[in-house]
Amino acid sequence: MENWQATEILPKIEAPLNIFNDIKTYTAEQLFDNLRIYFGDDPSRYNISFEALLGIYCNKIEWINFFTTPIAVAANVIRFNDVSRMTLGKVLFFIQLPRVATGNDVTAPKETTIMVAKHSEKHPINISFDLSAACLEHLENTFKNTVIDQILNINALHTVLRSLKNSADSLERGLIHAFMQTLLRKSPPQFIVLTMNENKVHNKQALSRVQRSNMFQSLKNRLLTSLFFLNRNNNSSYIYRILNDMMESVTESILNDTNNYTSKENIPLDGVLLGPIGSIQKLTNILSQYISTQVVSAPISYGHFIMGKENAVTAIAYRAIMADFTQFTVNAGTEQQDTNNKSEIFDKSRAYADLKLNTLKLGDKLVAFDHLHKVYKNTDVNDPLEQSLQLTFFFPLGIYIPTETGFSTMETRVKLNDTMENNLPTSVFFHNKDQVVQRIDFADILPSVCHPIVHDSTIVERLMKNEPLPTGHRFSQLCQLKITRENPTRILQTLYNLYESRQEVPKNTNVLKNELNVEDFYKPDNPTLPTERHPFFDLTYIQKNRATEVLCTPRIMIGNMPLPLAPISFHEARTNQMLEHAKTNSHNYDFTLKIVTESLTSGSYPELAYVIEILVHGNKHAFMILKQVISQCISYWFNMKHILLFCNSFEMIMLISNHMGDELIPGAAFAHYRNLVSLIRLVKRTISISNINEQLCGEPLVNFANALFDGRLFCPFVHTMPRNDTNAKITADDTPLTQNTVRVRNYEISDVQRMNLIDSSVVFTDNDRPSNENTILSKIFYFCVLPALSNNKACGAGVNVKELVLDLFYTEPFICPDDCFQENPISSDVLMSLIREAMGPGYTVANTSSIAKQLFKSLIYINENTKILEVEVSLDPAQRHGNSVHFQSLQHILYNGLCLISPITTLRRYYQPIPFHRFFSDPGICGTMNADIQVFLNTFPHYQRNDGGFPLPPPLALEFYNWQRTPFSVYSAFCPNSLLSIMTLAAMHSKLSPVAIAIQSKSKIHPGFAATLVRTDNFDVECLLYSSRAATSIILDDPTVTAEAKDIVTTYNFTQHLSFVDMGLGFSSTTATANLKRIKSDMGSKIQNLFSAFPIHAFTNTDINTWIRHHVGIEKPNPSEGEALNIITFGGINKNPPSILLHGQQAICEVILTPVTTNINFFKLPHNPRGRESCMMGTDPHNEEAARKALYDHTQTDSDTFAATTNPWASLPGSLGDILYNTAHREQLCYNPKTYSPNAQFFTESDILKTNKMMYKVINEYCMKSNSCLNSDSEIQYSCSEGTDSFVSRPCQFLQNALPLHCSSNQALLESRSKTGNTQISETHYCNYAIGETIPLQLIIESSI
């Protein structure tokens, strides 16, 4: 046994011609022989350390394998024995600049030498293995002659060799991995290198704002165009050009040794291109014509540092990779141990060996081309070139494109049915990663939109109060509103004080907003823009107690949204959706609408009709007494003047249609009255989009959907006290009315007490109250039909009943005995002229006297003088949430008043115009009947308008407390006199509450706002690395091996000390994200559930809370206090995940509420989803005050458009979007910390400033490194700036941009575009849109399936 050779024990290994394998085999044999020496029976041979043998063996195998890999092309290996003691090395290189000889008396350039300093980077690698005590015992025992002893010794040797082989392999991989990591740390992405090469600046030159912004934009464009370039197409020229750009963008190495890695044709390799196996295989297939296998000359030795006294490099020598083990054992422990000769198996003059490498011809240069798959195969370390990437996408839902601006850019004709789903889209379609069509509509986003936080203005109001008040001109525009409250009796007394003062009335913010068009609203010179922070609340400034305060009130209804955010045509489109949903029949009401419109706006109207209205005041018995008179008036005016009388009074219309079907009036006239009632009922049925029979909180569900059904909204004209089922506070004087203070009218009996109080403030009512049905119909008439057909050319009026009755009827023969009463004619000229005007001039005196006496008979049902009633009532339970719990809406209604459609002249002294509502405040009627108002209008002619611009008396001008606000009056003032306009006004009464939004969304009716959906997807990508030749020096020494003996095992630790030195003149390496390996998330349609993100919040009303949770799919009740505390502290996740996941990890789509008028072009390019850019390269982000102004100061134009924002509900500080997704507000919201928010990166101020500072630093540092060390600072170290890795892996966060997603508002458009592969171009098809993607992910996914 003592004479055995290594080849007799180890398995036979056939040594190929390749010399590297020869070295490996010979090294293994020598190691085994030396192990026998160490563990033999001769004690004199114990002079060799076992640890030293292991270190030498691993060192030799490690470096032989390194030199056989293509990555070694980028390395220059140098030995330095004291590298373990070196913490920071600084190597100086002297470089002589090339010169160009000149002539023509030009001074020749002088010889110039530059000293370049390069810093070393220490990076030790470690590995360890264990040998059991039993194994070591068998090794230490002397070899015996028995077969069992031989087998045990051989097995022990094999165990040692297996451990050594595994450790040596680990060091091989570790060396390559460490070198790869070093290359990556000094390899900026190609898009950065190309940008800096194009924008080179002097290293001492400070970047201007324009330069920095240009560089940033160039970085963004190059990043988006270079991502996944291997997947975009198979065009070899395109890919070849990108690879050539990678090679040309880097610099050469300081060391230009052309002996290493040279082909047989003496063509040196200029660099190496590395990538994961998938990318390399793709390149091999695409660029096969440029790829070949070359035999190159590879080094088998490494350099050796010789250090002088000055600690500077004075020479470089060469040393063999492997020393002879026999000579090492002889010299171990002596002075000659470091003077070993080269291995005996080599020719002493040979320092290179031939190696086959794949090469790629790029232009006139040759580069190595391979992957390192075998290095990382079956290990727990990922290939550094296989990286992760996060991209954030955004896309719109419910954006409105007006029909008047509609056009089609679709080349292929797409046919869509003429349905409102196609004319006002409420869905968005896109593909997930498996090419399955996904759809999101408003019903899907209810878990976000119907959360209690979204409908609570507490934080919005508080943050606005904490902000500085407007100053200068903006203060005078926004902060002049005063809220004036007076008791209703005093209102009538001071009604005209405003007009008598003849002073300009400041406009409130609502008026200012609605005077702007869509484009102007979003501009920075819009002073009201900072007050538009929430879609469901009006915010403004008011003067109170000589101080400026913030006022926040619910908008209550969709129609109260400013018209620039919800334009007229949009409301009409919503109405058409309701008509389609209700399947409203197309009964022709055009002729009726035409005659009613002409009657309301003709300007000629008999004053007797107003007297009759006062006498009847909705009383059936009074109507029956005057039935003959009324029929004669109607017949005359309809036949002679084609005017339909009493079309301004709902009560008269109902009485006529119910009691005059006996041919007392022309059939055509009666048909118009019946059509009017039918039309009103049609409107009611159309807007009843919910189940009327369903109850919620004890009320019909339809009350929560539309305000016209809500008993809290009162009819503006009433003659008897309406039902007060909602406990509204109704005030006629100083105190609210109660059941005890409201007196009952006693008709047909002596009612002297009421007659005495007819002109007092006491309120009388009838025993019979109007039914709920008639109340709803009357509100539809006065709030929809009358404004739409009269265009607000109507006015409220009060009548002094006492004086009118006394003057007209307290004369003979009315006060004479019955005999005289029947015989004597009427002597009142005024009354006779009124009757002739109403009946025509053909009536005799006897006939007119008879009519007058009939009028007199109806006085037993006379009502009282007109009063103004103030109605103060809270909102419905769904809107009574947060700050709105204490909100009380205000209405002023006319009690015993009437609606004038023409001025009264003859009886002017008895009638008083009362502009109490914007629908009923025609300045023409008011000015004609009141001299003070006329003078006021002459002084300020711009108030001669019907769109709400005519100022109401201050106690009646409570814009922010009223139900109908400026947008209603603006629409009704200019709308066409059509059924659609009536329906639109009714649809505008749809409520802005979570219940109403849920009802509308599930009925496929647009809820009045759009949404920006934001989703972050995760990708595994493959990168390419190009490094120039000898770009990095590796400084090494022999590994250090230590043994740690324990009871049953001995642990051997290998440590290889390495230092790396960059040898490039500039950036000598670069990377590019080339290939999409896999999509980790599903790219699907799962909506963020805010009930999980903010689990503690609940609606104030328990029934509402339960209903909402049920209808949006949140079945779990509110957590208990203990559960809530645990969620806030430790986070909580859904316990019931979907039972089946078909498409992988679900990506979350978050919802940002957005105005429907947001420009669709905003979604066609990368933008910040908050609506305003957040990357501030024009501002120094270290100046945080200036940075915050760039973020939030909307008096400054946005960096990307001429507008200040595209979504003030998200971009303004303290806006709804800011509160939901800015993590600074989470402490106030009880946030679930385990909820992921893709929007947080765009809203959190601290993160935005941090990434901007990082981006600012990245651009500045790369600009300093844009020149090589020959023409810039020689101390510059060309490594990646801090933040580069984060920039590459999360570009959307650093760019503060989300990317457009390929989507469309109609599935037909999506399918049409996918069929043609046209996914990167955005198109419009009338009211529909298709958004093109910036990165062609759709095509990439399709090509990979």
Swiss-Prot record:
GO cellular component, one term: host cell nucleus
UniProt-recorded Gene Ontology molecular function terms: structural molecule activity
UniProt keyword list: Capsid protein, Host nucleus, T=16 icosahedral capsid protein, Virion
Location relative to the cell: Virion; Host nucleus
Protein biosynthesis is among the record's keywords: no
Broad class of the protein's primary localization: virion
Physiological role: Self-assembles to form an icosahedral capsid with a T=16 symmetry, about 200 nm in diameter, and consisting of 150 hexons and 12 pentons (total of 162 capsomers). Hexons form the edges and faces of the capsid and are each composed of six MCP molecules. In contrast, one penton is found at each of the 12 vertices. Eleven of the pentons are MCP pentamers, while the last vertex is occupied by the portal complex.
Quaternary state and interactors: Homomultimer. Makes the hexons and eleven out of twelve pentons. Interacts with triplex proteins 1/TRX1 and 2/TRX2; adjacent capsomers are linked together in groups of three by triplexes, heterotrimeric complexes composed of one molecule of TRX1 and two molecules of TRX2. Interacts with scaffold protein; this interaction allows efficient MCP transport to the host nucleus. Interacts with capsid vertex component 2/CVC2. Interacts with the small capsomere-interacting protein/SCP.
Family: Belongs to the herpesviridae major capsid protein family.
Full protein name: Major capsid protein
Record lineage: Viruses, Duplodnaviria, Heunggongvirae, Peploviricota, Herviviricetes
